[in-house]
């Protein structure tokens, strides 16, 4: 369950009210801001599952089923499989095109650094994922990225070339806020992971994810997102910077 579906489950009105309360309590010094789009959903009465409509339509007329995996092609060589690439944020080069997992920078920035076209993949869990978002520095690179993901039996989705993409930015910022919570004595790491897994239906907690990608990757990704977006709320928490 992703964050948007989760807000439908909780209730858009409940989620928006809590977000505003937390934001106001910290005088705006939070890792997030209440979203006007969510307020518009509340005003429209689209409260989520309980009202039959929220981000998604629960009237039974539509389906939010996962996409069907796309058939493999010759790029499905074993050394390119994500589980064979080692820890952290691995990368490969295919026909002069660099393919790497996002480290917070856009594909265009990565291409300037590499001096070559670049495909940037969003984070995904290799064992369970059925789809993956990616950005590319040009259309030729995008074609290679789509073919590679299809070879991995993942449905490829080209998305806007933004810092941190979608999943990685979301997970990194959740880990950032979780680090703040530990520093403030709200809970310890195990407690936060358990609360999000069993209370909010997360498949894993933010600290478990951070262990998988590495603390240095969390910090560098957040720094790149903060620089690329210009939003200070993405600046790494002292919890993470003190551990690298």
Tell me the role of every PLM-derived stretch:
Residues 1-244:
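NAD(P)-dependent Rossmann-like dehydrogenase/reductase catalytic/cofactor-binding core
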